[in-house]
């Protein structure tokens, strides 16, 4: 479903992503782990078209990000993204945040969008918050709204950029539950995360990135219990000691 070939990204002389290739099957859930500064977030932003590629191809079904004639809005309908800091519009209510993109980009009628928005809020357990503003929500609630907003475009894949790292520990579980439910439903997901329990329990594959490269990948039990690369081994040793 997502095919990445020889992806490169650099800013001036700073090479952030080095010749990355990856195939993601429909319905596959992948966790991307690795130290800070390894290029994980830039990798996701490239997949979503938020960063211009310095080289290579990212194809989602028939769309190729390297195509100069690509309709980027149509591309982003296929691939949604959930950010670390929620990125909700503070001047809009929860429901208005969710229906904005379907109404403006997909030309869905407002009535249809409201119906869908309420269904999604019920899905993430926040229907009672439809008419409040983001400022009155907890961090966990904001992130669940952000997930509902991404789902409102009916994407075929979702990208999560450290969705729980800005949350208080007691709020992490409510967001992970929504993500686990999405994985069970067969949503294609690529998740940059430090939540190793989620990666082990929910994901089909774990990718370890370092220095802008995919250093190792495999099933969760392979990567976590028997890592082959020394950099993966050292990263996990530090992690388990915390």
What is the predicted function of each stretch?
Residues 210, 217, 221-242:
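C-terminal boundary and immediately downstream tail of ABC-type ATPase nucleotide-binding domains
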């Amino acid at each position: 479903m997502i095919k990445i070939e020889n992806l490169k990204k650099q800013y001036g002389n700073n090479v952030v992503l080095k010749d990355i290739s990856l195939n993601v099957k429909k319905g596959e859930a992948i966790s991307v782990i690795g130290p800070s500064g390894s290029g994980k977030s830039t990798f996701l932003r490239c997949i979503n078209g938020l960063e211009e590629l310095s080289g290579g191809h990212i194809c989602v079904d028939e769309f190729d990000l390297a195509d100069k004639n690509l309709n980027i809005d149509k591309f982003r309908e296929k691939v949604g993204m959930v950010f670390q800091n929620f990125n909700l519009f503070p001047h809009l209510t929860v429901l208005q945040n969710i229906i904005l993109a379907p109404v403006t980009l997909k030309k869905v009628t407002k009535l249809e969008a409201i119906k869908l928005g309420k269904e999604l809020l019920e899905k993430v357990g926040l229907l009672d918050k439809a008419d409040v503003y983001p400022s009155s929500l907890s961090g966990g609630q904001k992130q669940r709204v952000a997930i509902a907003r991404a789902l409102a475009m009916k994407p075929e894949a979702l990208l999560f950029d450290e969705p729980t790292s800005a949350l208080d520990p007691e709020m992490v579980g409510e967001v992970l539950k929504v993500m686990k439910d999405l994985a069970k439903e067969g949503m294609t997901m690529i998740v940059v995360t430090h939540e190793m329990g989620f990666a082990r329990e929910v994901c089909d594959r774990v990718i370890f990135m370092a220095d802008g490269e995919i250093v190792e990948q495999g099933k969760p039990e392979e990567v976590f219990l028997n890592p082959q690369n020394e950099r993966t081994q050292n990263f996990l040793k530090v992690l388990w000691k915390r």
